[in-house]
From Swiss-Prot:
UniProt GO MF annotations: peptidase activity
Name by which UniProt lists this protein: Oxamate amidohydrolase proenzyme
Annotated site location: Important for catalytic activity: 360
Record-listed E.C. numbers: 3.5.1.126
Length: 528
């Protein structure tokens, strides 16, 4: 799959084709890219339920045809009952169960804030009920189970089947659903109908919020109704990198947007255009190690930062990191942050308004906890907190956890505008770097830049080792060379879902829209 889809009026890219089609339908009805993205976000919460959902977080990067981008941080903070004392006697926060479900789910608040921006930009609005219609229909009528959902359910079954509400919601006769079977989510359909009738804000302030809070209390989750009511999405200023090819943007802390920009800022000072595969992988991997070190030293709740993160992206900060890379030897590597189940999606409309968006519940099926009578599986993003009170990521009520999520965008010197991203924990910034380097610097066609074999340093969902993982389609000589350089290479399948689900849309100066999706996903680039 090496040919991009090209359209003239609108383009939507998602890792599930039904979400792409939901966005496209809104574009055809005259909706904005933002409204189309809300429709896609709701749809994919239903059709890719192991990856994301209403019980997760979201981040937006909205790029208008002219002017600065607008970022939305729709991530939730730790609940008011999530104290260090509440976890006394434990070495770390559990990855599953009610104690893992300790942060407010923010993604729906991001939909609210994004639609407010859409109205401000366009002066019009489609009804929320229209934006949620496809999602409601898929939840009621059933979705075709993907191989990805079936595999995620089966592989994590023993650690999840006893979590509250999991078996009743996600299993069929006590087992993982079969790929290609029809899977219904009636409780989630009811929740979506409430949001359509009462408004999206009812998730935090209304009858739905009260239902959620009652379920949380019954399950022993450390989130209260007051925590839901206090939550609002925020609009932080995005991080900016001045690259030789143009201006790049990503999200500020608590995300690892710094990592994605730092990798490209470091490699911008290396000779990437003519690098062969082994050199490309080696240099980006070495830049990744240095960017991860910045992340691990600094990134936390933005109210607790000890540095101006934007200053870490200046030429003065990046040049020494580039100079420290040895083309003949791999540097030591200490390990990554871990997995992340996520979806990235992009939409560009006829006006040139572009959206880069990411939505996640962290691990596969998040905490595994499904709130009673809602069909909502709650995220376990709070597992990223530390129980060490001196740690940068120490747990505290009202504190935001670290996020791997980071949607990217670029406005290039030649007039192209690009939104791009990927799911995949530690792999997200690496995949962004691979895509940008191949397409922008090395002249590889957009779709081929995503389809070509990829690599991953560290861990992502489905993987627990910290090795340098390569897809098996890399040439044997490339794999051998990377081992000679000192990398701990592990070869995976030819097309491995561990590499994430990437996507991109490019708006060309002539107005044509080019979309590419990942053959590792169930996605589509849908345009008209």
């Amino acid at each position: 799959m090496h040919s991009s889809n090209v359209s003239t009026h609108g383009m939507a890219v998602a890792p599930h084709h039904l979400a792409s089609q939901s966005a496209l339908a809104i574009l055809r009805e005259g909706g904005s890219a933002i409204e189309a993205m809300v429709a896609a976000a709701a749809a994919i919460a239903v059709v890719y339920p192991h990856m994301n959902g209403l019980g997760g977080d979201g981040f937006w990067l909205i790029v208008p045809p002219e002017g600065d981008p607008i970022a939305i941080d729709a991530s939730g903070a730790a609940g008011s009952l999530a104290t260090l004392e509440a976890y006394a006697g434990q070495r770390h926060i559990p990855n599953r169960g009610p104690q893992a479900a300790l942060t407010v789910a923010g993604t729906v608040s991001g939909w609210v804030e994004a639609l407010r921006i859409s109205r401000d930009l366009t002066g019009r609005a489609l009804p929320v009920a229209r934006l949620l219609a496809d999602a409601i229909g898929y939840a009621e009528d059933g979705i075709p189970v993907t191989a990805s959902q079936a595999h995620a359910t089966a592989s994590k079954l023993e650690e999840l089947r006893h979590q509250p509400g999991f078996s009743e919601t996600w299993l069929v006769a006590g087992e993982a659903p079969r790929p290609g079977s029809r899977f219904r989510q009636p409780a989630l359909a009811g929740t979506l109908r409430m949001l359509a009738s009462d408004g999206l804000d009812s998730f935090y302030r209304g009858p739905l919020a009260e239902r959620l809070a009652q379920g949380m209390a019954a399950l022993g989750m450390p989130i209260t109704l007051g925590d839901l009511q206090a939550h609002r999405a925020r609009r932080p200023g995005p991080l900016t990198l001045q690259h030789q090819q143009g201006t790049l943007w990503n999200l500020a802390p608590p995300t690892q947007g710094l990592v994605s920009l730092a990798i490209l800022g470091i490699t911008d000072r290396l000779k990437m255009a003519d690098a062969d595969d082994a050199q490309t992988v080696h240099r980006i991997v070495e830049a990744t190690k240095r960017a991860f070190a910045l992340r691990d030293a600094h990134i936390t709740d933005p109210r607790h930062l000890d540095v101006d993160v934007q200053q870490l992206l200046t030429p003065e900060a990046l040049q020494p990191l580039a100079d420290s890379i040895d083309d003949a030897s791999a540097s030591p590597w200490g390990g990554g942050k871990g997995p992340g189940d996520t979806v990235w999606m992009g939409v560009v409309d006829n006006s040139g308004l572009a959206v880069s968006f990411i939505q996640s519940i962290y691990h596969e099926f998040g905490s595994g906890v499904v709130l009673p009578d809602t069909g909502i599986v709650w995220q376990n993003r709070g597992a990223a907190f530390s129980l060490d009170p001196q740690h940068l990521l120490a747990l505290a009520p009202g504190k935001q956890p670290f996020h791997t999520l980071n949607p990217a965008a670029a406005r290039l010197n030649d007039g192209r505008v690009m939104v791009y991203g990927s799911m995949g924990g530690d792999g997200q910034p690496q995949t962004q770097a691979a895509l940008f380097t191949r397409y922008i610097l090395q002249g590889v066609p957009l779709q081929e830049s995503i389809s070509r074999p990829r690599w991953l340093l560290g861990r992502t969902w489905g993987q627990s080792s910290d090795s340098l993982k390569l897809e098996g389609r890399f040439a044997p000589a490339c794999i051998a060379r990377l081992r000679e350089l000192g990398h701990d290479v592990e070869v995976l399948a030819d097309f491995s879902e561990a590499m994430g689900h990437a996507g991109a849309i490019v708006r060309h100066p002539n107005g044509l829209l080019e979309g590419a999706t990942d053959p590792r996903s169930n996605g589509a680039a849908a345009g008209y």
